[in-house]
Amino acid sequence: MSVPLILTLLAGAATFIGAFLAVLGQKPSNRVLAFSLGFAAGIMLLISLMEMLPAALAVEGMSPVLGYGMFIIGLLGYFGLDRMLPHAHPQDLMQKTQQPLPKSIRRTAILLTLGISLHNFPEGIATFVTASSNLELGMGIALAVALHNIPEGLAVAGPVYAATGSKRTAIFWAGISGMAEILGGVLAWLILGSLISPVVMAAVMAAVAGIMVALSVDELMPLAKEIDPNNNPSYGVLCGMSVMGLSLVVLQTAGIG
């Protein structure tokens, strides 16, 4: 099994961490969850704009028109899908003030899981594509995706467990959304594994960079603000950028990057 695929599997499996935290009663504070989402957004923004897009444009045979065009396609494609898909978020369950009936919350969990899964599918592709092109950047994306998945698993599993009393059911529904990312990575492995053209890989990477920027701005940062309205998610974003930037410098200085 390839290292990029393993990173994708680990990132998707992070959903189970949130699910287990929910059923074990060790729920992190909203402040921690919001900071982790901002941190993840910072990692994605820095890698996408400072590493992935420039690396794609630097590939021999890649024209600026194609590179920036694919980046814009990634941006617009994400926003288009985001408007078309069921727009359910983890806070839809986290903010419930009344105890719903198990049947009602089960239906809500299904819709929420469907929405999250459809949104998470491109993240699996992004993790695999990035790691295939540059393992160092792929590790950063995998970390950001994993941080994003923990609150999602927590938000889905917690209310389901409270309503049904079944840890297995709660973990099951939370795990489905993580499996969507794993599926995305597997499909990318099967499809892109046979494409050897550097230009094709660079074009895909530019589009993925656009997707990650849109995800950070449209999903992670607003969600962080909703979970913890009293704190500015920009602090998490700046910390994520700083930590990722320093780690890239260290790795490149050591000759790893």
Swiss-Prot record:
- Which residues does the record give as Fe(2+) binding sites? 120, 123, 149, 152, 181
Reactions the enzyme catalyzes: Zn(2+)(in) = Zn(2+)(out)
The UniProt keywords, alphabetically, are: Cell inner membrane, Cell membrane, Ion transport, Iron, Membrane, Metal-binding, Transmembrane, Transmembrane helix, Transport, Zinc, Zinc transport
Care to name a GO molecular-function term for this sequence?
metal ion binding
Question: Cellular location of this protein?
Answer: Cell inner membrane
Instruction: Please list the residues that bind Zn(2+).
Output: 123, 148, 152
Q: How does it sit in the membrane?
A: Multi-pass membrane protein
Q: Which InterPro entries match?
A: ZIP (IPR003689), Zn_transptr_ZupT (IPR023498)
Pfam assignment, any one:
Zip
What protein family is recorded? Belongs to the ZIP transporter (TC 2.A.5) family. ZupT subfamily.
What is the recorded function of this protein according to its Swiss-Prot or TrEMBL entry?
Answer: Mediates zinc uptake. May also transport other divalent cations.
| Protein's UniProt name | Zinc transporter ZupT
The record lists the organism as Escherichia fergusonii (strain ATCC 35469 / DSM 13698 / CCUG 18766 / IAM 14443 / JCM 21226 / LMG 7866 / NBRC 102419 / NCTC 12128 / CDC 0568-73)
This protein's encoding gene: zupT
